[in-house]
């Protein structure tokens, strides 16, 4: 494998071409009248989606230089998606426009460092202006409006998500699952809880696309101990492996030989297993493990105080649940199947008594957190349809809408449809620049701020964007938007065309930051396959398998 250094105009041209391809593929999904994109798979039917992040992630150009550029963009999109779960389409539209305008300025001989200074100065002013526009989300109707917009105008999705928030509260746990039925969307409230601990190794992941561990009908082993060696849990691991069901281990920690053995057996396929740290610290950890035991029907939380040893545990003494979902940061236990509601209610009453008798505000707060986790439950959005393709496309929109709803509840909302970004233009009019090239950078952001609303209007089949923008900018009502569903101007909040501030803010921030990286990028070193590599690969004849690696 040889490598090549690409610089100058060749690099600039490649960046422009890749960004244009990505924006063309992703931008068509923007707005309620945006179109879908089909992503081919190595097996099965193509996936149909309007999820901008999925589209960006799937684009892998054959050319090594184009692939390197696409990977930089995909990494930024991934960070944007991790932060807020939505906004990658807006981010790609903004990035493409900034890079297009910067290329023109570079070709005219402008100082790129000064342009970058102007771009970053304008970015901070725009972010401050967005914060001043926000309005808090208070009502169920407003929550439904936000979810509807993010679901590309699907009111049923908006109403169901608002119903979930009403069921479990604004801080409650809401998950999305595929249903085997034909009903498009249904809501099910079940027992369960979520805590802030993720998987201890990424090798436990079962869904590599979303980096999740997803288990159905798992056993749950609870212990206050730290697991360093595999021997104490070997008997129960063998029993679980024979049962064919997954296992979740919740312990103070799992490390060393114990962790490596669990990972190895997961990779070999001998056991579907995952391990997470127990939530909390000290006595609170003990209490929360007790809560999980009550919820899942586990007979014991193994500790030094308990007479029973881990080696003597039976399957009947482990906890169970309908589903478990683990990310790198959180664990969600859904619908414990064997727990007694009487036991849960008794535990809830016990915590309420502790709250009443506690004299410490801090202790009361922690007890209330435990109470909320036990009593709040989990709302499950079940997505159905007549085909797998339809279900997956709808599930993408439901997940985007759910992320947007959480963002709106957290930071509030701003006028939607690209209007909020457009209205920040006014703050850039009075922004002082040090020189002409820095002013060029500010002007680039001015043009970029118009790109999202232009794309949304274009996707609706209209070429009237310049007139719409001119009308919005000449009047003083910053709640006025253009509704592409009705093709009329309307108030953002009464018509429900609103966006979560957090989504708009992060999409803009990431877009400008990514464009700034490309502005001063002077060279890329890319690997290119040589003829020798091709010959060596042909003569190697493959590595063969590694033989049968037994279980424990």
UniProtKB/Swiss-Prot annotation:
For this protein, the Enzyme Commission number is: 5.6.1.7
* One GO-annotated biological process of the protein: protein refolding
Location(s), subcellular: Cytoplasm
Disulfide pairs here are none
- Its EC top class is isomerase
Reaction equations catalysed: ATP + H2O + a folded polypeptide = ADP + phosphate + an unfolded polypeptide
The entry marks the following residues as binding ATP, namely 29-32, 50, 86-90, 417, 499
The UniProt keyword set, sorted, is: ATP-binding, Chaperone, Cytoplasm, Isomerase, Nucleotide-binding
Q: Which GO terms describe its cellular component?
A: cytoplasm
Q: Which GO terms describe its molecular function?
A: ATP binding; ATP-dependent protein folding chaperone; isomerase activity; unfolded protein binding
* Family membership: Belongs to the chaperonin (HSP60) family.
Q: What does this protein do?
A: Together with its co-chaperonin GroES, plays an essential role in assisting protein folding. The GroEL-GroES system forms a nano-cage that allows encapsulation of the non-native substrate proteins and provides a physical environment optimized to promote and accelerate protein folding.
Q: How does it assemble?
A: Forms a cylinder of 14 subunits composed of two heptameric rings stacked back-to-back. Interacts with the co-chaperonin GroES.
Protein name, UniProt field: Chaperonin GroEL
Q: Which organism is it from?
A: Ehrlichia canis (strain Jake)
Tell me the classification of the organism that encodes this protein. Bacteria, Pseudomonadati, Pseudomonadota, Alphaproteobacteria, Rickettsiales
State the encoding gene: groEL
């Amino acid at each position: 494998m040889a490598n090549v250094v690409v610089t100058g105009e060749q690099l600039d041209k490649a960046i422009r071409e890749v960004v244009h391809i990505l924006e063309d593929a992703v931008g068509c999904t923007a707005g309620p009248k945006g179109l879908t994109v089909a992503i081919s798979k190595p097996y099965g039917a193509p996936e149909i989606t309007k999820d901008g992040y999925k589209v960006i992630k799937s684009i892998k150009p054959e050319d090594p230089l184009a692939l390197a550029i696409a990977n930089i963009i995909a990494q930024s999109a991934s960070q944007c998606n991790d932060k807020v779960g939505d906004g990658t389409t807006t981010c790609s539209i903004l990035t493409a426009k900034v890079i297009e305008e910067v290329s023109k300025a570079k070709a005219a001989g402008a100082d790129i460092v000064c342009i970058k200074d102007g771009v970053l100065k304008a970015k901070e002013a725009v972010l401050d202006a967005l914060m001043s526009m926000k309005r808090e989300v208070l009502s169920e109707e407003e929550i439904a409006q936000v979810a509807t917009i993010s679901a590309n105008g699907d009111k049923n999705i908006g109403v169901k998500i608002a119903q979930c928030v009403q069921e479990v509260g604004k801080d409650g746990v809401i998950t999305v699952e595929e249903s085997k039925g034909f009903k498009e969307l249904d809501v099910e409230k079940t027992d369960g809880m979520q805590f802030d601990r993720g998987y201890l190794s990424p090798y436990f992941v079962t869904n590599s696309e979303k980096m999740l561990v997803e288990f159905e009908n798992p056993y749950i082993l609870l212990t206050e101990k730290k697991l360093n060696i595999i021997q104490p849990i070997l008997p129960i691991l063998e029993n679980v492996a024979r049962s064919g069901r997954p296992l979740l281990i919740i312990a103070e920690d799992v490390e060393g030989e114990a962790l490596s053995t669990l990972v190895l057996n997961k990779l070999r396929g001998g056991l579907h297993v995952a391990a997470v740290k127990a939530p909390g610290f000290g006595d609170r950890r003990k209490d929360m493990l007790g809560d999980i035991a009550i919820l899942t029907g586990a007979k014991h939380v193994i500790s030094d105080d308990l007479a029973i040893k881990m080696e003597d545990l039976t399957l009947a003494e482990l906890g169970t649940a309908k589903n478990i979902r683990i990310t790198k940061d959180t664990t969600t236990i859904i619908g414990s199947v064997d727990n007694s509601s009487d036991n849960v209610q008794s535990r809830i009453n016990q915590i309420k008594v502790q709250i009443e008798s506690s004299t410490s505000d801090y202790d009361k707060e922690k007890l209330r957190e435990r109470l909320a986790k036990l009593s709040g439950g989990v709302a499950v959005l079940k997505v159905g349809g007549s085909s797998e393709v339809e279900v997956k496309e709808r599930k993408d929109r439901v997940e985007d809408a759910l992320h947007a709803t959480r963002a709106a509840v957290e930071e509030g909302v701003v006028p939607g449809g690209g209007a909020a970004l457009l209205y920040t233009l006014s703050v850039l009019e009075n922004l002082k620049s040090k020189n002409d090239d820095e002013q060029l950078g500010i002007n680039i952001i001015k043009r970029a701020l118009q790109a999202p609303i232009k794309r949304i209007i274009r996707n609706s089949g209209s070429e009237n964007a310049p007139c719409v923008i001119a009308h919005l900018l000449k009047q003083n009502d910053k709640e006025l938007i253009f509704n592409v569903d009705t093709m009329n101007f309307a108030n953002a909040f009464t018509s429900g065309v609103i966006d979560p501030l957090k989504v708009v803010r992060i999409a803009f921030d990431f877009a400008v930051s990514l464009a700034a990286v490309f502005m001063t990028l002077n060279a890329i070193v890319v690997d290119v396959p040589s003829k020798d590599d091709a010959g060596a690969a042909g003569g190697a004849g493959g590595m063969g398998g590694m033989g049968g690696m037994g279980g424990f």
